Amino acid sequence: MHLKAPEHQVAGHIAKDGKPGPLVDDKGRFFKPLQGDSRGEIEVKFYESFSSNTEVPAHIRRYFPVYHGTQAVESSDGAAMIVLENLLSKYSKPSVMDVKMGSRTWYPEASEEYIQKCLRKDARSTTVSSGFRISGFEVYDHKELSFWKPDRKLLNGIKVDGVRLALRKFVSSNTLSDTSSKPDSAFASSVYGGSNGILTQLLELKTWFENQTFYHFNSCSILIIYENESIQDGDARAQVKLVDFAHVHDGNGVIDHNFLGGLCSFINFVRDILQSSDDQSTQD
Amino acid sequence: MLKVPEHQVAGHIAKDGKLGPLVDDQGIFYKPLQGDARGENEAKFYESFSSNKNVPDNIRGYFPAYHGVQLVEASDGSGQLPHLALEDVVSGYVKPSVMDVKIGSRTWYPDVSEEYFNKCIKKDRETTTVSLGFRVSGLKVFDHEESGFWRPDKRVVLAYKVDGARTALRKFVSSNPLADSVVPDCAFASEVYGGSNGILTQLLELKAWFETQTLYHFNSCSILMVYENDESVDDAPRRARVKLVDFAHVLDGNGVIDHNFFGGLCSFIKFIKDIVESSENCCENGH
């Protein structure tokens, strides 16, 4: 089994200072180290439950990574790892964005220390104000022919306008590191719009969240992916995926109103960009 | 002639010489402008809302009509004080059952004082606000067997957990809310919550607006539910009505939807929907 570090991680843990990070193989699988304390356990428990939950409709299942159980991996000192579908294996030049959903990342079952840590982070970011925050993104620059990633510290301090700008840059073709030029949002309708675009997928997810009471997806992210190789021909292969289930708890008959509120807010941001880019192109 | 409203279930009450709202016999509700910024903020909201052309007509009906600020003899004897003159949403009802539900998984909002934040978050965590996205603030329900009202104490209501909130919502549409040892009969669930003019239909209309409106953030606002119990007239309609109230903490939306209110509203809708569905199943099974 030939394992290496994934190329396009935009958020979450990476292999650093001797601590294990995620790995990918050449068969389309993603190996995530089981996090210490209860988080790894909770994530496994979620995947086990979800993969055998017959009440999850098939069209919703596509928004979740396929689960392949757990495995001890030699190159990580026999550490146990969760084996998942590598969401990027079928992409050759993916642009990826990680958006943490919900107006709070803490939840009643968490420890007081964790709750306070989350409250601080939520207040400093757009989580409280907008119901979501951008954890990270990487976008392909079609002029520079390379990937660009914003500075992590910069991202942590952005406000609502910064979020809008990031969502525009994410679907732009012009030079991204040049802050003086306005992002052209050239790919907005291919990526965000259309019958298979991001907006359509998010709306499908939203309908499920209005009724499902199985899980509360605390601190989960939505990953947005699209292909740059084919985008110039209008073929974005845009995909929405939910990831990071270390804090998921039972819904206990209550909908995940925290995730739903944030998702609805995010949908509005995406829709606004799509509409303003549509308006722009009709004016040109 | 002004008097203390009969059907207040939450908020300040003008009792025992305290300052509180008053009603007249013309269907107007007078709410004293609170000393701090809150009264000013509420008046500012009503001024803005009543003249905001971007609010659709069908949504306007969910808000009390605004009749400006008027000088009125205060309930605590302190003389003429400015009061918000509003539509009295329960006038015209003979024996109304009323419930006040505070919507949102948080009652605080960005940029409040640390003191206010701590007060709010403590209450939010102790009640169902954090867990359900809403909490019951108060209610009074007419009991058809006892011919009187069930009006649980405020402390009891604030101690509700998920099951308590669900039971209160069931009792709200029951004919026997005072009977403790008996299961609430949900006798009026389909007439009050269900139907083409019922509470659920109205909540869904509100929800559609909240999915895209970025005009206001309704921090700490309540939904009031009212319906008629008077049976002196045969087949009297229940006239179930939803109204949004309490706008002391409303802020500009600034281009962002009120995701806090929206999430809580969806959770509340799910609870109501479940009660309607289980009461329909009850009838089918001949209970």
Where do the PLM segments sit?
Chain A
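Polybasic, positively charged surfaces/segments
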Residues: M1-D284
